[in-house]
Amino acid sequence: MKKEKLGALVFWASLLVLAVCAFLLAGRPTLIPTGIPGDAVAFGMGAEEVTQTAGPPDGTRSENGVRTGFFLYYYQREVLGCPATVSYTFHGRQESPRARVAEVAVDMEFATQAECDQMLEALCAHFRELMEGEPRFDEYGSEGPVRAWDPPELLQSRSITSARRSVFISQFPCRIFLEVRGNG
């Protein structure tokens, strides 16, 4: 009789330990690299982790209206050897420990359109190589403004998506704007 009770107790204790481990793993965010060349920040990081990884931001901004979030700005970064401004968008309030990186935006300006064209192709090649093995990979490109809300100066846009991240690259005269969103 004691053997049966001890066996049942061990069974229920191991089941409880398994449930606690599953709960702890489910509550931890999955970190997915942004994919931006030279960027060590990952989707799912909190603000403190980002500042430890990328250093103190050059600027911050909070949005506490219909959408709640905040932004960390880094003005003196490099992407593929070119100067860039990088901003990280967090969902949630800045004081919340649960606020996580949800989007990264990169803004780059060039002296000539040829440099801009080369960077566009380099970024597309980088993200294509990075993402084409991921589930639900897709790539789409368009020339000029297509949607009603596209700015008239838009030269072309490229979208590269997968199950892990979505990349949107917009090319303007001598300027590229890149957005990467985590899909996790």
Label every model-predicted segment.
Residues 1-17:
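N-terminal Sec-pathway targeting helices
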Residues 19-33:
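Membrane-interface motif at the C-terminal end of an N-terminal transmembrane signal
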Residues 31-93:
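N-terminal leader/targeting segments
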Residues 60, 102-104, 163:
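Generic beta-strand hydrophobic packing signal
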Residues 61-68, 94-97, 137-143, 168-172:
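Short, ordered beta-strand-loop transition motifs
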Residues 67-73, 145-147, 176:
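Short beta-strand micro-motifs in enzyme catalytic cores
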Residues 81-146:
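Long, charged/polar, surface-exposed segments that mediate recognition or autoinhibition
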Residues 109-111, 148, 152-184:
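An acidic-aromatic pocket/loop used at catalytic or ligand-binding sites
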